[in-house]
Amino acid sequence: MVRTYGLTHINLMVRDVKRSLRFYGQVFGVEEYGRSEGLVHARTPGCQDVITFDEQASGAGESRGIAHFGFRLVSPGDIDAAVDEVERAGGTLLRRGEFSPGYPYAYVADPDGYEVEIWYE
C-alpha cells in the first residue's frame, strides 16, 4: 500500500471559470487561493480539499466515468437551504430523499452539468 494523506483534489473542466467559482463559492463556501492561465484553485471550508476549475469548452460537464462527488452537511436540517442555494446560484435539483430517517440527501447539477451530492451523515 502506498502511504498518502488521502484524496487531495479534483479537477473539473468547465466552460466559464468565473461562473463555476461563483457557484461553488455561493453554495459551498469554496474560496480561491491561486490561479494560473485558465485554472482557478479553490479550497473547501474546514479542510485542505481542493477543487480546480479548468476552463475548457470541450469536455466541460462530461463525467468520463465519475458519477458524482459530494459535500457533507453539518446538520440534517440544512438540506432545504442547500437546495434553495443551489437553485439561486444557477444549479438544478436532480433528486432528493433520505438514506434513512434523519439522514437526508440531494443530488444537484452545477451550471456545467456535474452531479454533486449534498448529504448528512
Q: Where do the model's predicted regions map?
A:
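Short, flexible, solvent-exposed loop/turn segments with mixed acidic/basic and small polar residues
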Residues: 1, 57-60
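Short beta-strand micro-motifs in enzyme catalytic cores
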Residues: 38-40, 49, 67, 102-106
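Vicinal oxygen chelate
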Residues: 1-3, 7-15, 61-121
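Core segments of cupin and vicinal oxygen chelate
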Residues: 4, 11-54
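Conserved segment of winged-helix/HTH DNA-binding domains
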Residues: 49-51, 59-62
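Acetyl-CoA-dependent GNAT
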Residues: 54-58, 120-121
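Proline- and acidic/polar-enriched loop/turn elements at helix boundaries
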Residues: 36-37, 78, 98
